[in-house]
Amino acid sequence: MNTFVYLLFMMAVGALIGGMTNFIAIVMLFRPYEPIYIFGKRLPLTPGLIPKRRRELAEQLGKTVVEHLVTPEGLRRKLTDPVFVAEVADWGREWLKRWLSRRETPAQLLERLGVHAPDEWLSELAAKQAGRAYEQWSETWRLRPIRDLLSPELKETMESRIESLADYLADRVIDYFSSEEGKRQIAGMIDRFFQERGMVGGMMQMLLGNVNFVDKVQSELGKFLRHAGTRAMLARLLWTEWNKWISYPLAAVEEMIGRQRIKETVSAAARGLVRNNDWLDRPLAELIAPYERELFDRFVPQAANAAIHALSDKIEGIVGKLGLADIVRNQVESFSLRRLEVIILSIARRELKMITYLGALLGAMIGAVQGIIGLWL
């Protein structure tokens, strides 16, 4: 019985010493927070390990986060994950729905963005952009013939209407000369014709009679313009002029009309298009309504996917610019030692307790061995 009590006592003492040793070692990781001096001499192991190595701990944590935890590769995998992309698209749809539900007009949106008199600002912007776009387009195409500027469909459409244009012009000329004003024009031309012939012309005019001659010329002119051969000739003339015109370079057209004048016309058209439209005062939801399905089903997912891939392509630079290591280091250094202790203990409390218990177990085993040796000796 005495032997058993003796061994139990040795194990208890060993467990107490082992457990307390490990407990004190764990406490000394954090405590004391400040160095302790006795008679001007700093006590060894003060301050504790973590307070003493706080800066190095912060730097190592920052490096660990950047090099092993929050890496560009890991962020890229997360960004390009189909589930995440779908979630971003859903978020985009929800945001767009909320935004459209406010019934905000383009004018109100521009005013909220700091634009005063949105209609004037937008019309001038459209005019400048249209003028600039024409200049850039002209610089690219001004030495090319006009036929190269026309799409095949437009060229075919215009050429298919040349014969009908010839008929239209002939009919309009007939209508004009059949009118009273046309008759006066014919009479005037006949009078000038005879006057230019002097006495002979006057005698001819007296013999023929002006009115009957006007009717005769008017009738013959109508027959001439209605004749199929005349219209075919007019169509050939239009074809010749058309082919000549489309062979001119754009620069020649600009020279005839004036490049600045063309630019001003384009700018004025763009300005008028904005000013003479009420879309600035209509709700965005109403303007987008015809395209809402395509906007939500196609545009938003495509925009989300494009934005995510653009972000993914630049992720290394973004991570570098963010300076995650510095952020972690500064954050850890800003923690109070008490808070740092609480954070570490909240993470490793169970493991630290197990270390204390392991020390007690090892102490008990050592005490038992010592007791057995003591009894044997």
From Swiss-Prot:
Cysteine disulfide links: none
Key words of the record: Cell membrane, Membrane, Transmembrane, Transmembrane helix
Pfam family, one: DUF445
Protein's cellular compartments: Cell membrane
Major location category of this protein: membrane
Residue ranges of the TM segments: 7-27, 357-377
Keyword Lipid metabolism assigned: no
Keyword presence, Glycosyltransferase: no
GO CC, alphabetical: plasma membrane
Bilayer topology annotation: Multi-pass membrane protein
PANTHER family (alphabetical): UPF0754 MEMBRANE PROTEIN YHEB (PTHR35791:SF1)
Protein family membership: Belongs to the UPF0754 family.
Name of the protein in its database record: UPF0754 membrane protein GTNG_0550
Record organism: Geobacillus thermodenitrificans (strain NG80-2)
Taxon lineage: Bacteria, Bacillati, Bacillota, Bacilli, Bacillales
